[in-house]
Amino acid sequence: MIFKKEVSKEDVECVETLLMMSNSKPTREEYNKLQLCILRRNKSSTITTPSTVMESKSHIHDHSLRESPTRRSRNRHDLPPMSPPMEQRKSKKAKRSTDASSSKTREPTPGWLISLMRSKNGGDVEDNSKKIIDKELFQTDVDPHQSRLSIPVSQIVELEFLNHEEKRAIEEDANRVRKEGVDAILVDSHLREFPVNLRLRDMRGILLYNLVAGWNQVVTDCLLEENTNIRLWSFHADDTLYFALVPLYAN
């Protein structure tokens, strides 16, 4: 048989103190109050019956359900900040993508290059120029022992700059240990001409065009150095492949 007995004042104080401590980090005052409640309860002769325990649990549950909005709000504010909205993250990603591809835009062909193409093509004013790349030269690009300008295929602005015969020569080179490449002429803005050779290489899965042969002379005569920014164009005249080099000096 179960006897009901009223919950003692000490028990109620203990429960209320525990409830406050469960919702947030206990303060020193709350901790001391709990210790005092326990001491008082131990000194009390009140006997707790099963029904008393059930009533105490019910009392705790009711208090939890009636938790004040202020306390709930405080707990929410303790949470770490939420991640940015999906639209904001997409916007940032798009901005990075735009920044990364900004060097792949097509600027107008320089006037001196149009005049050169006209003279090479017998007065024909058709602009068949292709923008190849904007690039900051690395140390290896100006190293005389390397003797080549590296052009990553993934960074080329207009990929269709080779004619049919040149493409076939590049494809046949793929199975050769000693590359033959495609002969070309590089012209600078002073209209100086340098014989060069274009070759395609696969560097561990990364496709690179290399300008070789006369590249060291280009570096010397055009005063190219590491960190120099250049823009490279191409065009055809009488079925000959030309490259046009434009150093991009800071203002």
From Swiss-Prot:
DNA-binding region range list: 153-249
Compositionally biased tracts (Basic and acidic residues): 56-70
Alphabetized Gene3D superfamilies for the sequence: DNA-binding pseudobarrel domain (2.40.330.10)
Record's keyword terms, sorted: DNA-binding, Nucleus, Transcription, Transcription regulation
Stretch list, region Disordered: 48-111
One GO molecular-function entry: DNA binding
Highest taxon of the lineage: Eukaryota
InterPro entries, alphabetized: At2g31720-like, DNA-bd_pseudobarrel_sf
Cellular component GO terms held in the UniProt record: nucleus
Cellular localization per UniProt: Nucleus
Name assigned to this protein: B3 domain-containing protein At2g24670
UniProt organism field: Arabidopsis thaliana
